[in-house]
Amino acid sequence: QLADPNTTHYFSNIALYNSGRYFHMLFTMPAVCLAMYRAIPAGPKRKATFGFLFSIALTAFITGVTEPISFALLFASPLLFVAEAISFAISFVIAAMAKVTIGSTFSAGLVEFLLFGVFQGNAKTNWIWIVIWGIPIFIANYFLFKLLIEKLNAKTPGRESDEEAEKKLSN
């Protein structure tokens, strides 16, 4: 379908029901990293943790690899991981309702979004809905995860006590 000039709109059930991953990789996971960063009290830990959180957010955004973020949530609090899973599921529903049909090969990051969405044209993929819905999804997930991290007192990166941090480093 990608090479066929007669294709006016992609209708692959795989692409239709798999395009929600783009919301998650491009918007939800960077929002989660920002929430983790902003939940760290101001001080040296916040500055020291910035590089880690920025790099895993950037990795999720560009390549779609989200395991470092997911594991940080899972180990900090399983409830944060459940919230991520629910957010992920909602992303699929929104993408299917908007009839977004962006294919992917591996991960649904920015590279694949451009190759299989933007470069194929909005008429074929409805890629614009990823951006239109992605911004409110980013905002909602940022506030949701910041609230959950603070209410659960989750020990996300940078929020652990000095004793816990030293113990981790000594092992």
Protein language model regions, located:
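A short, structure-level motif marking secondary-structure boundaries and short turns
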Residues: 18, 41-42
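Transmembrane alpha-helical segments and their short flanking loops
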Residues: 1-16, 29-34, 38, 55-56, ...
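Generic hydrophobic alpha-helical membrane-segment signal
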Residues: 23, 52-58
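Membrane-proximal intracellular helices of multi-pass ion channels
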Residues: 36, 42-52
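Structural signature of hydrophobic alpha-helical transmembrane segments
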Residues: 18-26
